[in-house]
Amino acid sequence: MNVSFAPLFLVTLILLGVVSNNNSITISATILLLMQQTALIQFVPLVEKHGLNLGIILLTIGVLSPLVSGKAQVPPVAEFLNFKMISAVFIGIFVAWLAGRGVPLMGQQPVLITGLLIGTVIGVAFMGGIPVGPLIAAGILSFVVGKG
């Protein structure tokens, strides 16, 4: 008997999202549960293939939108030479590199995704994190278990 625990897992995520007042988990898990339980299941492979990229695009739009609205200004070149700005640039490079290591690891060892997701959910639900953690977590994990 082949039983899928995905619906139970999604309901658990929905409950965790409600209890922790985390709309991103609640909405995401609800949409996936509705897709899984209806004819929308046919679009799950499309979400699986393109969802991460679309999510990163939306996140980037959200981060850049204050520049467009005028709420944030592009700093003058001279400000790029202070310690905080230089640190921000190097940390941004490092985190992007970590995420770049994480994506191949998730593809090569997909069983690790479950652990990364559980850790991310706990971090989002109970520690005030945001669900961008799996990529960075996979990048850090690549140092522990080896890349690929």
From Swiss-Prot:
Tagged with keyword Lyase: no
Recorded GO CC terms: plasma membrane
Subcellular location: Cell membrane
Topological relation to the membrane, as annotated: Multi-pass membrane protein
Keywords: Cell membrane, Membrane, Transmembrane, Transmembrane helix
Source species, domain of life: Bacteria
Database matches in Pfam families: DUF441
Parts of the chain that traverse the membrane: 13-35, 50-70, 80-100, 121-141
Protein family according to the UniProt entry: Belongs to the UPF0756 family.
Name of the protein in its database record: UPF0756 membrane protein NMCC_1816
Organism: Neisseria meningitidis serogroup C (strain 053442)
Upper lineage: Bacteria, Pseudomonadati, Pseudomonadota, Betaproteobacteria, Neisseriales
